UniProtKB/Swiss-Prot annotation:
One of its GO terms (biological process) is killing of cells of another organism. This is Thaumatin-like pathogenesis-related protein 3. Transmembrane segments: none annotated. Associated with resistance against stem rust fungi. SUPFAM superfamilies: Osmotin, thaumatin-like protein. It comes from Avena sativa. Residues 1-21 form the signal peptide. It comes from the Eukaryota.
Length: 169
């Protein structure tokens, strides 16, 4: 048992050494406030027009999502949003509909990212990594996005990359 634990520890150490946290720069170019939300990292916060904020996402994060909520009103962390609402919570633990989603998996020698409108479309979005293709979604029919679960719209990016999400580019 000690040998398998040592091998597992060594494999985890090698994986961790090759991957580091990613910084997601989120910019709101809309003429109104957007309330970005993220799972499993990012929670939720207010982002006024023309403001930017960073979220640090640890290596090994898979099935991550970031989206913008609109028409929100919160009081002590509870409230509602016209689009992208997540059960009335400021800090989200699930994604809400409709919402244009930036999806990602971070870690190892490659990261993966995409835009999805499977759950609906609510905001124009650009999503890019520092070493990959810039994805653009301006309307519900955007060609860079997943529209159905079987679409092929995932892109690879070098590991240890950083990301930019822009609402209303």
């Amino acid at each position: 048992m000690a040998t398998s634990s040592a091998v597992l520890f060594l494999l985890l150490a090698v994986f961790a050494a090759g991957a580091s946290a990613a910084t997601f720069r989120i910019t709101n170019n809309c003429g109104f406030t957007v309330w970005p939300a993220g799972i499993p990292v990012g929670g939720g916060f207010q982002l006024n027009s023309k403001q930017s904020s960073n979220i640090n996402v640890p290596a090994g994060t898979s099935a991550g999502r970031i989206w913008g909520r609109t028409g929100c009103s919160f009081n002590n962390g509870r409230g509602s949003c016209a689009t992208g609402d997540c059960a009335g919570a400021l800090s989200c633990t699930l994604s809400g509909q409709p919402a244009t989603l930036a999806e990602y998996t971070i870690g190892g020698s490659q990261d993966f990212y995409d835009i999805s409108v499977i759950d609906g479309y609510n905001l124009a979005m650009d999503f890019s990594c520092s070493t990959g293709v810039a994805l653009k979604c301006r309307d519900s029919g955007c060609p860079d996005a997943y529209h159905h679960p079987n679409d092929v719209a995932t892109h690879a990016c070098n590991g240890n990359s950083n990301y930019q999400i822009t609402f209303c580019p």
